[in-house]
Amino acid sequence: MPIVAYMFFATASHNSLFLPVISKNHAELPSEFVSLNEEKVVLDKNITVLGFPGSNIDEVKANLFNLNQKIYNKYGGFKDFQMVMILPDGNQDKIKAIMLEFRRLSNDLKNWHFLFGKPEAIETYYNTFKFKNKLDAFTGSPFVYILDKEKNLRGRKGQKIKGKVEYRECYNTISAAELHNEMSDDVKILLREYRLALKKNKRKDDFRDKIEQEVIKK
């Protein structure tokens, strides 16, 4: 791992090498959801921040800006990282306006994805996760979730804070401080986890190649 990357990943405030799995094997994004740019968006093989902003965009716009500033601007450059927001159809123009504002604050928005669908389809998909929080009357929630490349929900479980057992499956976008601290740390740990696994696999491949070369020489 390059020294710059090592220093970046080492800045997480808690030193866990792995982010706990809260629940496993969640469903892929339904094909009926259409992205803003009509590109194909999938959860599989991506680290995903998943959110459901709802149809009251004017009221929750600040939450999206919090996400952009505190999370996306830090991690959007990783090719296997993405932000996926699912909201009711009919809000495309408002999201386009928000993306125009984002472009003044961020250099590259290619890993921001907004998907649109019918409210009942969104609620059906949301319920498959069995999250503790429910969607509101606008088919939205201020909470976002971290999914790994295998579509497992990640968070905090069993870590001690002031003598208490911590459980966290989501992050509140209303709180810029929570995104900046807890969520940023957790995304960083998950990215580091995959980088360490990649490095370990590369060492195995190099060792295997070396053995094969020695056998060929004989």
Region spans (language model):
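N-terminal targeting signals for export/organelle localization
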Residues: 1-34
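Short active-site neighborhood of thiol/selenol oxidoreductases, capturing the structured segment around
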Residues: 39-67, 81-84
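Extracytoplasmic
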Residues: 44, 78-81, 139-142
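Solvent-exposed coil/turn segments that connect beta secondary-structure elements
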Residues: 54-55, 88-89, 119-120, 149-151
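Structural microenvironment flanking redox-active thiols in thiol-disulfide oxidoreductases
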Residues: 60-115, 119-125
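Sec/Tat-exported extracytoplasmic proteins
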Residues: 71-75, 126-129, 133, 187, ...
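Surface-exposed short loop/turn segments
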Residues: 120-140
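Thiol-/selenol-based redox modules, centered on thioredoxin-like
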Residues: 140-218
